[in-house]
From Swiss-Prot:
An individual GO BP term: proton motive force-driven mitochondrial ATP synthesis
UniProt keyword Acetylation, yes or no: yes
Classification of source organism: Eukaryota, Metazoa, Chordata, Craniata, Vertebrata
Entry annotated with the keyword Membrane: yes
Assembly notes: Component of the ATP synthase complex composed at least of ATP5F1A/subunit alpha, ATP5F1B/subunit beta, ATP5MC1/subunit c (homooctomer), MT-ATP6/subunit a, MT-ATP8/subunit 8, ATP5ME/subunit e, ATP5MF/subunit f, ATP5MG/subunit g, ATP5MK/subunit k, ATP5MJ/subunit j, ATP5F1C/subunit gamma, ATP5F1D/subunit delta, ATP5F1E/subunit epsilon, ATP5PF/subunit F6, ATP5PB/subunit b, ATP5PD/subunit d, ATP5PO/subunit OSCP.
Molecular-function GO terms, alphabetical: proton-transporting ATP synthase activity, rotational mechanism
Organism: Sus scrofa (Pig)
Role this protein plays: Subunit e, of the mitochondrial membrane ATP synthase complex (F(1)F(0) ATP synthase or Complex V) that produces ATP from ADP in the presence of a proton gradient across the membrane which is generated by electron transport complexes of the respiratory chain. ATP synthase complex consist of a soluble F(1) head domain - the catalytic core - and a membrane F(1) domain - the membrane proton channel. These two domains are linked by a central stalk rotating inside the F(1) region and a stationary peripheral stalk.
Keywords noted in UniProt: Acetylation, ATP synthesis, CF(0), Hydrogen ion transport, Ion transport, Membrane, Mitochondrion, Mitochondrion inner membrane, Phosphoprotein, Transport
Secretion signal, residue range per the UniProt entry: none
One Pfam family hit: ATP-synt_E
Name used for this protein in its record: ATP synthase F(0) complex subunit e, mitochondrial
Length: 71
């Protein structure tokens, strides 16, 4: 097995600093984007509800048209 390589404390500090800054940035960015994504999901759900309602109405009208033609 190869012995571990000695790494400068300055390089270690730089690596851990970059890691910490990346985690902090990611948390900040996530907290910034989370409300926007929730709003987009809410709007998409409302639009889907409206589309489903329109499709249901169209289907009922089509069935009513078929029933009236056949009778």
């Amino acid at each position: 097995m190869v012995p571990p390589v000695q790494v400068s404390p300055l390089i270690k500090l730089g690596r851990y600093s970059a890691l910490f800054l990346g985690v902090a940035y990611g948390a900040k960015r996530y907290n910034y984007l989370k409300p926007r994504a929730e709003e987009e999901r809410r709007i998409a759900a409302e639009e889907k509800k409206k589309q489903d309602e329109l499709k249901r109405i169209e289907r009922e009208l089509a069935e009513a048209q078929e029933d009236s033609i056949l009778k």
